[in-house]
């Protein structure tokens, strides 16, 4: 379970970085060269999703819970936005959904 969650976390970071770098280019005038590491990060994201032994749709659904939490962590650390009680509640619900799916995929 810990290995799966850690892999999902790294996967989410790759996806967020792969989307954030083009955002910097488009919104903040960063160099177009940032698109190269963005593409590499997104390619790594896709590859990491293939490392799970469950069916792809089940992996994507479970990954979503960790992605939500990672995005909120990014919101706090990178964007400097204080999380609200709604953010925390949403993260808890998302993680519960992920946990149910991951526990279930080992039993089917």
Swiss-Prot record:
Cystine connections: none
Main subcellular location of this protein, as a coarse class: membrane
Stretches in topological domain Cytoplasmic: 27-30, 82-84
TM ranges: 6-26, 31-51, 61-81, 85-105
Keywords assigned by UniProt, alphabetized: Cell inner membrane, Cell membrane, Membrane, Transmembrane, Transmembrane helix
Alphabetized Pfam families for the sequence: UPF0060 (PF02694)
Highest taxon in the source lineage: Bacteria
GO cellular component: plasma membrane
Topology with respect to the bilayer: Multi-pass membrane protein
UniProt xrefs under InterPro entries: UPF0060
Stretches in topological domain Periplasmic: 1-5, 52-60, 106-108
Entry keyword annotation includes Ion transport: no
UniProt-annotated location(s): Cell inner membrane
Similarity section: Belongs to the UPF0060 family.
Family annotation (PANTHER family): UPF0060 MEMBRANE PROTEIN YNFA
Protein name stated in the entry: UPF0060 membrane protein YnfA
Gene of this entry: ynfA
């Amino acid at each position: 379970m810990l290995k799966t969650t850690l892999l999902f976390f790294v996967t989410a970071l790759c996806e967020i970085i792969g989307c954030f770098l083009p955002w910097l280019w488009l919104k903040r005038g960063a160099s177009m060269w940032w698109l190269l590491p963005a593409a590499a990060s997104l390619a790594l994201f896709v590859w990491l999703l293939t490392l799970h032994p469950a069916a792809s749709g089940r992996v994507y659904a479970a990954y979503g819970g960790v992605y939500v939490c990672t995005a909120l962590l990014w919101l706090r650390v990178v964007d400097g936005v204080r999380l609200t009680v709604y953010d925390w509640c949403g993260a808890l619900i998302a993680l519960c959904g992920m946990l149910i799916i991951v526990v279930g995929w080992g039993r089917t």
